[in-house]
């Protein structure tokens, strides 16, 4: 078994938020929570929505936070229009007619009938709105729940960050589940059964955390049918320039992985690397330094070892421009407003890696996203070119 991680316990607030974010996590429960929440929002019982959401969540085992958020889609900005529609719908259902919009009509209005119309129309609109919202949620969430084994695995890997900050935990949950590269690494047979894995520019260590969690899950007998055999005894190394991100990786992995805070161009590399992952890193360094970095890593790899390089394809039109915009915004938020990026086309990346003694294939890696990402799967030749 892998060594146990040395982590501090999450705070009470973190545990409460964790419960609210993760309870009722199946596809059907998600749909019921959104549908019932919107039904509560449309209901005429104004002032009781919070209590109704808590009670429904407890009664049916649904996510109370999502119930309440869905209820608040019917907010004060649109509530007057909703109430008007409910009264008119109720009047039409009760009497076959609607209220005339005149002062005389309202002056002779029967309060009892008005209240009955509001209740009747509100309940009908509540049921219809809830059904539509629930069905749409169920359909739209289909892709997310298409692979429940991987969803469960990513959730467990993200939980390693729970005691750091809620932001780091939420980022890990979203990134591991939404970025197709992580599932590809586990399901495509690229992981060696043993040996050395190096993640260059590992950030908070998401890939390493996922591999470590996969190893633990496999030891416990939880491994998806049809997937390649999981790693066993794989030594994990991460290299990260940013101290804060490196600290998060150390927290999540403990003594399961060695995390080095260093510039990848100067870092100490382990010997006989079996798999090197370089995700979204090379474009961050100047072009003259890209080749030497690849050569330096290649020199530390075994013959036949694998290098996985994920980059954006600069020839991909608007999808590449979207990547470029996202990177620019991220750099601004990190205070790196003068950052420069050295992008290349997928063909140019392939040529660069081939020049360092790799047999390279290109796999699209933007499924489910609007981004022009590709994964270069580079196998080091047994006899490298001089």
Question: PLM features: residue spans?
Answer:
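A short glycine-rich, Lys/Arg-flanked "PGG" loop and its adjoining helix->strand segment in the class I
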Residues: 291-303
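A conserved beta-strand element that flanks and buttresses the S-adenosyl-L-methionine
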Residues: 277
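Transmembrane helix boundary and interhelical junction motifs in multipass membrane proteins
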Residues: 42-55, 60-70, 75-85
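Conserved glycine-rich SAM-binding loop
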Residues: 203
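Conserved alpha-helix/loop element of class I SAM-dependent methyltransferases that forms part
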Residues: 176-193, 214, 218
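C-terminal alpha-helical "lid/dimerization" subdomain adjacent to the S-adenosyl-L-methionine
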Residues: 310-355, 363-365
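Class I SAM-dependent methyltransferase Rossmann-like catalytic core
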Residues: 153-185
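Class I SAM-dependent methyltransferase SAM/SAH-binding core
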Residues: 198, 206, 210-258, 263-265
């Amino acid at each position: 078994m892998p060594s146990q991680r040395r982590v501090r316990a999450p705070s009470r607030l973190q545990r409460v938020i964790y419960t609210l974010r993760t309870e009722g996590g199946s596809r059907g429960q998600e749909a019921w929570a959104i549908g019932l929440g919107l039904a509560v929002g449309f209901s005429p019982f104004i002032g009781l929505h919070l209590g109704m959401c808590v009670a429904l969540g407890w009664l049916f085992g649904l996510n109370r936070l999502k119930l309440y958020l869905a209820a608040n889609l019917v907010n004060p900005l649109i509530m007057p229009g909703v109430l008007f529609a409910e009264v008119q719908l109720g009047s039409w259902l009760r009497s076959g007619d609607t209220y005339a919009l005149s002062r005389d009509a309202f002056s002779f209005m029967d309060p009892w009938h008005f209240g009955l119309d509001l209740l009747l129309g509100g309940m009908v609109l509540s049921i219809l709105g809830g059904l539509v919202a629930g069905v749409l949620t169920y359909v739209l969430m289909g892709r997310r729940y298409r692979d429940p084994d991987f969803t469960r695995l990513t959730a467990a890997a993200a939980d390693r960050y729970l005691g750091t900050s809620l932001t780091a935990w939420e980022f890990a949950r979203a990134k591991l589940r939404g970025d197709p590269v992580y599932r590809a690494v586990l399901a495509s047979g690229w992981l060696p059964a043993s040996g050395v894995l190096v993640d260059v520019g590992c950030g908070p260590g998401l890939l390493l955390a996922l591999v470590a969690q996969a190893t633990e899950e496999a030891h416990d007998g939880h491994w998806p049918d049809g997937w390649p055999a999981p790693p066993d005894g794989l030594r994990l190394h991460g290299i990260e320039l940013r101290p804060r991100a490196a600290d998060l990786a150390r927290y999540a992995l403990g003594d399961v992985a060695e995390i080095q805070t260093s510039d990848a161009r100067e870092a100490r590399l382990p010997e006989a690397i079996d798999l090197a992952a370089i995700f979204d890193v090379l474009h961050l360094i100047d072009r003259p330094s890209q080749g030497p970095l690849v050569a330096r890593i290649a020199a530390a790899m075994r013959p036949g070892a694998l290098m996985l390089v994920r980059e954006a394809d600069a020839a991909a039109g608007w999808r590449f421009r979207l990547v470029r915009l996202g990177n620019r915004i991220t750099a601004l938020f990190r205070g790196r407003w003068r950052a420069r990026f050295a992008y290349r086309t997928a063909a140019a990346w392939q040529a660069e890696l081939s020049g360092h003694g790799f047999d390279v294939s290109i796999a699209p890696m933007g499924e489910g996203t609007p981004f022009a990402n590709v994964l270069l799967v580079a196998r080091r030749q047994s006899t490298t070119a001089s």
